Every structure is written in structure tokens, then in C-alpha cells.
């Protein structure tokens, strides 16, 4: 059932950040930085897939996603929800159920046998499709799915990520250039604010994380990762 109450966006962002800490989805390792799909190296990592294992948490997060979409996109803007392989698929199912909409999922590439399909499920030509991912860094993976939906005849004007890194100016430009409005609930700044408030990181760790968030590509380049985004 679609919820129609609208929490303050700042409250939802703070609550999601607290949830991610509570379920131990936030990880830090500056000595051996995490490698992201973009090729970047990062001292911090968020595992949003863990949200699925906590029913009360995931229900609240879906409430937040619905409120964000209804507030910022509208009530009758979508014909279908598309989940990106693989982490976006379960969240697409949950969101589609909340919004009483059909669901499809999109592979990163055609499967190479059978119908050689990249999109699974029924999507009418011209359907207005919302693409969902658990998180997005700079938008590259989301546009893999957006481009596939558009190539198959769908219309994509909106995407949603439960968590958005929010530290790359290039990301905002990518979505603007791609004519897609990105919706999201929380960013790294929200997670860091909770860490500071609840003293979840010591001062040295906070400083290292802030150094990354303030200049992520420079930090990545110094630590064995890419220093530019494609």
C-alpha cells in the first residue's frame, strides 16, 4: 500500500544514516582501501544490501523512498519500476509493491543465450520507467540500465538510489546531461554527521574520511585507484 505521509527529507536522511550504522553496513579501512566499480579506491564502503536482512529497517527505508518520490516526482509519473542487476532487483520488487506498479529488471549486458534479453519482464513500448539502485557513486552503473531501458523503448526521466555518494560534481552533470532527475535519501555527509555525533569514529578516522569526501579522486589516485571518472 502506498504511504502518503511525508517526513522531512533531513529527518529521513539522518534516520537512514543511523540505520546503516546500526546494522553495521558502514565499513572503514584506510590501510587497504576498498575498490569501487568505477575503479576508485575509497577508505569507506557502504553495503546497502544488508538493509534487506532487517525487515523493520527495510520497511522504513521503502517508506522513505516512496515519500521522496511522491514529494519530488509526483503520484502518477511512472508505469513501471526497473531494478538494476543485481542489488537493485530486490529493492525494485519492494518499491513496485508499495506503488502497486509492474516491475522489470535490467541486466548489465544481454545474457548471451536464449532470447539474449537484457530486460526481463514485460515493459510496454513508451512506458515511463523509474530505475532504482541501492546506491550510486557517480551514476555510471545507473546509466547502463537507463540506456538499456531507453534502447528497448522505455522512457526514463527519473532514477532513485537509496544512498548517493554525493561527493562528485561530475555525477550531477551526468544526470543533467542524461535528462534524468536523480532522487535519493541519504549521502556520505549524513553518515559522517551521525558518526561525529555518536562518536563512532575517532578523530584520526574522521579526518581521513573527511579528506576522502572533500577530494575523492585525489585521495583515490594517491592510494592506487583512478584519479578521473570516465
UniProtKB/Swiss-Prot annotation:
<dbReference type="InterPro" id="IPR004467">
    <property type="entry name" value="Or_phspho_trans_dom"/>
</dbReference>
<keyword id="KW-0460">Magnesium</keyword>
<feature type="binding site">
    <location>
        <position position="111"/>
    </location>
    <ligand>
        <name>5-phospho-alpha-D-ribose 1-diphosphate</name>
    </ligand>
</feature>
<feature type="binding site">
    <location>
        <position position="107"/>
    </location>
    <ligand>
        <name>5-phospho-alpha-D-ribose 1-diphosphate</name>
    </ligand>
</feature>
<dbReference type="GO" id="GO:0004588">
    <property type="term" value="F:orotate phosphoribosyltransferase activity"/>
</dbReference>
<comment type="subunit">
    <text>Homodimer.</text>
</comment>
<comment type="similarity">
    <text>Belongs to the purine/pyrimidine phosphoribosyltransferase family. PyrE subfamily.</text>
</comment>
<feature type="binding site" description="in other chain">
    <location>
        <position position="108"/>
    </location>
    <ligand>
        <name>5-phospho-alpha-D-ribose 1-diphosphate</name>
    </ligand>
</feature>
<keyword id="KW-0665">Pyrimidine biosynthesis</keyword>
<feature type="binding site">
    <location>
        <position position="113"/>
    </location>
    <ligand>
        <name>5-phospho-alpha-D-ribose 1-diphosphate</name>
    </ligand>
</feature>
<dbReference type="InterPro" id="IPR023031">
    <property type="entry name" value="OPRT"/>
</dbReference>
<comment type="pathway">
    <text>Pyrimidine metabolism; UMP biosynthesis via de novo pathway; UMP from orotate: step 1/2.</text>
</comment>
<dbReference type="GO" id="GO:0044205">
    <property type="term" value="P:'de novo' UMP biosynthetic process"/>
</dbReference>
<comment type="function">
    <text>Catalyzes the transfer of a ribosyl phosphate group from 5-phosphoribose 1-diphosphate to orotate, leading to the formation of orotidine monophosphate (OMP).</text>
</comment>
<dbReference type="Pfam" id="PF00156">
    <property type="entry name" value="Pribosyltran"/>
</dbReference>
<dbReference type="InterPro" id="IPR000836">
    <property type="entry name" value="PRibTrfase_dom"/>
</dbReference>
<feature type="binding site">
    <location>
        <position position="137"/>
    </location>
    <ligand>
        <name>orotate</name>
    </ligand>
</feature>
<dbReference type="GO" id="GO:0019856">
    <property type="term" value="P:pyrimidine nucleobase biosynthetic process"/>
</dbReference>
<dbReference type="GO" id="GO:0000287">
    <property type="term" value="F:magnesium ion binding"/>
</dbReference>
<feature type="binding site" description="in other chain">
    <location>
        <begin position="133"/>
        <end position="141"/>
    </location>
    <ligand>
        <name>5-phospho-alpha-D-ribose 1-diphosphate</name>
    </ligand>
</feature>
<dbReference type="InterPro" id="IPR029057">
    <property type="entry name" value="PRTase-like"/>
</dbReference>
<protein>
    <recommendedName>
        <fullName>Orotate phosphoribosyltransferase</fullName>
        <ecNumber>2.4.2.10</ecNumber>
    </recommendedName>
</protein>
<keyword id="KW-0808">Transferase</keyword>
<keyword id="KW-0328">Glycosyltransferase</keyword>
Amino acid at each position: 500500500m502506498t504511504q502518503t505521509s511525508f517526513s522531512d527529507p533531513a529527518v529521513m536522511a539522518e534516520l537512514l544514516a543511523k540505520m546503516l550504522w546500526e546494522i553495521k553496513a558502514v565499513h572503514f579501512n584506510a590501510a587497504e582501501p576498498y575498490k569501487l566499480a568505477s575503479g576508485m579506491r575509497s577508505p569507506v564502503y557502504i553495503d546497502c544490501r544488508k538493509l534487506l536482512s532487517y525487515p523493520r529497517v527495510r520497511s522504513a527505508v521503502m517508506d522513505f523512498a516512496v515519500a521522496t518520490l511522491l514529494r519530488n516526482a509526483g503520484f502518477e509519473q511512472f508505469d513501471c519500476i526497473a531494478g538494476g542487476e543485481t542489488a537493485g532487483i530486490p529493492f525494485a520488487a519492494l518499491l513496485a509493491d508499495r506503488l502497486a506498479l509492474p516491475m522489470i529488471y535490467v541486466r548489465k549486458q544481454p545474457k548471451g543465450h536464449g532470447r539474449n534479453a537484457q530486460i526481463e519482464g514485460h515493459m510496454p513500448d513508451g512506458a515511463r520507467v523509474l530505475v532504482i539502485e541501492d546506491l550510486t557513486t557517480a551514476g555510471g552503473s545507473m546509466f547502463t540500465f537507463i540506456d538499456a531501458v531507453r534502447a528497448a523503448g522505455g522512457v526514463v526521466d527519473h532514477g532513485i538510489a537509496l544512498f548517493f555518494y554525493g561527493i562528485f560534481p561530475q555525477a550531477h552533470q551526468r544526470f543533467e546531461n542524461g535528462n534524468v532527475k536523480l532522487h535519493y535519501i541519504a549521502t556520505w555527509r549524513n553518515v559522517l554527521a551521525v558518526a561525529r555525533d555518536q562518536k563512532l569514529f575517532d578523530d584520526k578516522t574522521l579526518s581521513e574520511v573527511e579528506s576522502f569526501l572533500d577530494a575523492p579522486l585525489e585521495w583515490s589516485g594517491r592510494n592506487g585507484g583512478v584519479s578521473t571518472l570516465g
